[in-house]
């Protein structure tokens, strides 16, 4: 069985909200959140990261420190939020409250204007995870990614219905274990 640990990037310079494909840098606090999360964790055989700098910059640092191979995986990018990118929920409540409510109630059924459908996001993330599982069978990977990627994988691993996806909470710099079964499905690891 392939063991996959998921690490969410730390706090970013532009703050929270719908960051999506925006390429924000980490704050010093964000760097520290990630360093603290991996302290004493591992060992890993391979590091895999989203190419966005809030993930990849830390991945490069950790790979150099630990002498590990690093693979940047474009399909582990965050969900693209279209017209909502760079905005937060409070801002959207001013002019898009109904749309935001539809997204929160059914993220698979409502796509933000100009955004990536969640079913498409899910497909690319699951293909990427299955590819990693096959390529690195039996190894332990650290995957540095985004809240949306982690929510998706953790919700599936926990057997949650799709409409409960947004109930999965993942903090900045949170490290969570996952495994990939021989069939490729994410499986929760008890912590």
Segments (PLM) and residue ranges:
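Active-site-proximal alpha-helix that buttresses catalytic centers in soluble enzyme cores
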Residues: 3-68, 72
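Glycine-rich phosphate-binding loop signature in dinucleotide/nucleotide-binding domains
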Residues: 41-43, 132-139
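Short basic (Lys/Arg) and small-residue
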Residues: 146
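Phosphate-handling substructures
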Residues: 64-124, 167
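Active-site catalytic microenvironments for nucleophilic, acid-base chemistry
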Residues: 61, 65, 131, 135, ...
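Short, active-site-adjacent cap segments at secondary-structure transitions
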Residues: 13, 54-56, 78-80, 149-151
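Nucleotide donor/acceptor-binding cores
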Residues: 2, 138-141
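Domain-level recognition of soluble alpha/beta enzyme cores
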Residues: 161-185
């Amino acid at each position: 069985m392939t063991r996959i640990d998921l690490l969410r990037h730390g706090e970013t310079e532009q703050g929270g909200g719908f960051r999506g494909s925006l390429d924000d840098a980490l704050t010093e606090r964000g760097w520290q959140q990630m360093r603290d999360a991996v302290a004493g964790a591992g060992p890993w055989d391979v590091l895999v990261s989203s190419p966005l700098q809030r993930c990849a910059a830390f991945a490069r640092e950790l790979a150099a420190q630990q002498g590990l191979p690093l693979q940047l995986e474009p399909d582990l990018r965050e969900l693209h939020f279209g017209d909502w990118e760079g905005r937060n929920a409070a801002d959207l409540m001013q002019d898009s409250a109904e749309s935001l409510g539809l997204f929160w109630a059914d993220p698979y059924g409502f796509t933000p204007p100009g955004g990536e459908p969640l079913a498409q996001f899910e497909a690319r993330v699951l293909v990427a995870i299955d590819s990693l599982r096959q390529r690195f069978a039996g190894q332990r990977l650290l995957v540095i990614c985004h809240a949306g990627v982690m929510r998706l994988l953790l919700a599936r691993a926990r057997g949650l219905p799709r409409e409960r996806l947004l109930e999965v909470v993942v903090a900045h710099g949170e490290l969570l274990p996952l495994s990939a079964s021989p069939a490729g499905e994410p499986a929760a690891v008890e912590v």
